[in-house]
Amino acid sequence: MTANPTSTASTGSAHPPMTHLPAQKHGAIQQLFDGVWFVRGVAKLPMLVPVKITRSMTIVRGVDGLVLFNSMRLTEAGLAELDALGEVTHVVRLAGFHGRDDGFYRERYGAQILAIEGQAYVRGLGKPGPSYLEPDAWLTADSPLPIADASLRVIG
């Protein structure tokens, strides 16, 4: 399933359409192990003084497709590399401020978003606000995961 990367058109799902941030500079997808890949990139933060931070996304072959950890929006060339690996079926958000691109993968691929219970998708630091995205499922230490023989340890 593909969609216009900045589309706000309905995906036909129960989730409201979103406007997505553009892809930023990143490297090639690198295979680390059989069924495990990694890609590094950067993010420019919209602050008074411009700040760049490094980002990374891990891709794991799961039970029924690819699982993305700490999603990072890829360029069209990067998405072609990702598509060559298989179908994206799940996105896992492990920590706060690591999910800004989760909605992009939900809209483009119909991926199910999983997030650690108690997290919120909010913009900005230190100022609670409305959630801009809701996961399809909240994860706890006892939740089933989309990777065979995987387990989750929740810290905090």
Residue map of PLM features:
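Long, non-catalytic terminal segments
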Residues: M1-L45
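Short, flexible loop segments at the rims of nucleotide/cofactor-binding pockets, characterized by
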Residues: A14-P17, L45-V49, V67-M72, H90-R93, ...
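Active-site metal-binding motif and surrounding structural segment of the metallo-beta-lactamase
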Residues: R73-I116
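Short active-site-adjacent helix-start/loop capping segments
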Residues: M47-L48, L68, E76-L79, G99-G103, ...
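Conserved beta-strand scaffold positions in the cores of enzyme catalytic domains, especially
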Residues: V36-F38, V91, I113, L152
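Metallo-beta-lactamase
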Residues: E117-G156
